[in-house]
Design a protein with these regions (language model features):
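An N-terminal, well-structured beta->alpha segment
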Residues: 1, 5-50
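Glycine-rich phosphate-binding loops that contact phosphosugars or nucleotide phosphates
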Residues: 46, 50-149
Length: 149
């Protein structure tokens, strides 16, 4: 190997190790945030007689799609509902016995907030997961889980 190749290889390894350290730190921070709200949310999911509906916009939507797919593949009936479609007629997929998980970094996404009155009318349990526990989404959901990573 040439010196340039060795330096490049070392840079790649250093970058990968640095990335993994950042992710480990994030997971440790997330672990420290787990509280009774998380326990309650898990209890709701375990007791759910309907399906788990997951919603989110943008990057939160991508995470929501993955969460819903993982739940479905492990035996929990689940679907992803795009919030924009939800406020324009697709809320018919949500029933009283469902649990709806609302993912939003800021907790202020307009489309997400527009869903809440209808979800309350349906009578389903809502769990918001946001970075901001004082956000409108956090305050208006049945339960909030803070996720500050």
């Amino acid at each position: 190997m040439t010196n340039n190749k060795i330096e490049t290889s070392q840079n790649i390894l250093n970058s990968a190790r640095g990335f993994l350290r950042i992710e480990q730190d994030g997971l440790r921070a997330l672990e420290a945030q787990l509280d009774e709200h998380f326990v309650t949310a898990v209890e709701w999911l375990l007791a759910c007689r309907g399906k788990v509906v997951v919603t989110g916009m943008g990057k939160s939507g991508h995470i929501g799609r993955k969460l819903s797919a993982t739940l479905s593949s492990t035996g929990t009936p689940s679907l992803f509902l795009h919030p924009g479609e939800g406020v324009h007629g697709d809320l018919g997929v949500v029933a009283r016995q469902d649990v709806v998980i609302l993912l939003s970094n800021s907790g202020t996404t307009e489309e997400m907030l527009q869903l809440l009155p209808s979800l309350r009318s349906i009578g389903c349990q809502t769990v918001s997961i946001t970075r901001n526990p004082s956000s409108p989404l956090a305050m208006q959901a049945s339960l909030h889980i803070s996720c500050q990573v």
